[in-house]
């Protein structure tokens, strides 16, 4: 409250996704309860590309995230080719696989795994692994001992608690309750 009153802030403008919008809403409600009037405007920016916009109109943030992701993914693919290895990338997107798909498509990745692939079945670690292994086998048959797969983080967010427990994966969670995939540890 002190920051807002000291600086005579009358308008809170936020740019971001769901978490940013909900945080801004909580701030505005807190200030309102303290009898401090403030207007709150939120500009949706999401790399998920999942807002109901006209066909062919990407969300603010998606194109730049896809372009930067494709630069990284191309470099990883070159490393895979020159080293004769396979690499697996994870792309952001808690609830939609658009970014992973866009990156994988731009780089012609042999395997792209997105949550939308599992709309009629439960996502399991075994299914994810089998998809990647099937791609490795197909490429080997074609005479290629290298490759890369991109997996949307939404695939991991959709794992059931039981599946996570069985896998031995230990998640930490951010302040919004989302698993922090960059801080995953394995049970010993």
Predicted feature locations:
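Anion-recognition interface
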Residues: 44
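A structured beta-alpha segment of the ubiquitous adenosine-cofactor-binding alpha/beta core
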Residues: 1-9
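Accessory alpha-helical/coil subdomains and C-terminal extensions
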Residues: 3, 14-16, 24-37, 41, ...
């Amino acid at each position: 409250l002190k920051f807002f009153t000291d600086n005579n802030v009358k308008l809170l403008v936020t740019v971001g996704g769901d978490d940013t919008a909900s945080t801004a809403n909580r701030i505005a409600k807190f200030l309102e309860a303290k009898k401090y009037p403030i207007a709150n405007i939120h500009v949706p920016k999401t790399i998920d590309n999942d807002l109901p916009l006209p066909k062919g109109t990407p969300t603010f943030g998606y194109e730049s995230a896809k372009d930067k992701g494709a630069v990284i993914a191309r470099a990883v693919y070159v490393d895979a080719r020159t080293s004769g290895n396979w690499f697996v990338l994870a792309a952001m997107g808690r609830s939609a696989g658009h970014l992973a798909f866009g990156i994988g498509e731009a780089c012609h990745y042999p395997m792209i795994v997105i949550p939308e692939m599992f709309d009629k079945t439960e996502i399991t670690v075994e299914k994810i692994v089998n998809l990647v292994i099937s791609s490795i086998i197909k490429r080997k048959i074609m005479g290629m001992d290298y490759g890369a797969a991109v997996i949307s983080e939404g695939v991991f967010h959709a794992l059931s608690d039981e599946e996570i427990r069985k896998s031995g994966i230990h998640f930490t969670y951010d302040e919004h309750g989302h698993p922090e995939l960059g801080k995953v540890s394995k049970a010993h």
